[in-house]
Amino acid sequence: HRPDPSLSTAENFLRMLRPDMQYTPLEARVLDVALLLHAEHGGGNNSTFTTRVVTSSGTDTYSAMAAALCSLKGPRHGGANLMVMHMMQNIRDNLHDIEDDEELEAYLKKLLHGEAFDRKGLIYGMGHAVYSLSDPREVVFKGYVEQLAHEKGRDKDLSLYTRIERMAPQLIAQERKIFKGVSPNVDFYSGFVYEMLGIPMELYTPLFAVARVMGWSAHRIEELLSANKIIRPAYKSLGGTHDYIPRSQRA
């Protein structure tokens, strides 16, 4: 389907995604909120910092946006909600009774000890590099998630998310000795929302880019207007010094 200029980005996305072009007002509103919450998040996140660094070299807009996309493609930046979705499916596959809090808690402990899922010792969707008390984006988003889950008849799945949200901070403090404060981030629920909207997983990161291109563009404009020097971060070598080894003696 072709886009309709009279519709919002969220409405057009859902309209073009679906064979019947139909969507509910709540679906469009929830996706619109998701795009708003992902549109900008300061200059320190990896893709936005990439935009500013590349812009400072004097390159063109297309190249700066391409560099930002390369950053977002990395799973540590753009793939967080995918990891949450894979983890949640792993939990469903391995619990006998998904509503049993004791069994769920035991499995979350296995995750933290690197004994389950990808064995990285993480509960994905929990914690953030900047936020400790709460991720304000998640606080705003959760109310819409609850409304959509109710409309879609997914209250049981929502319950699993909210129980993990309740248990995880205490378990992380208890098992990993991390006491600075851990709370769910926006990625914890975003994949669940996209799934309820029928959006394929392959589009989760591109959808992130659809939103974040606004923030990238704003930072690029600011860099062009207010800075006149190339960004060159300082680095300090921590490798120590070593005696020179002749090439003939090197392994």
Model-derived regions: residue spans:
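Non-transmembrane, aqueous-exposed alpha-helical and coiled segments at domain scale
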Residues: H1-A251
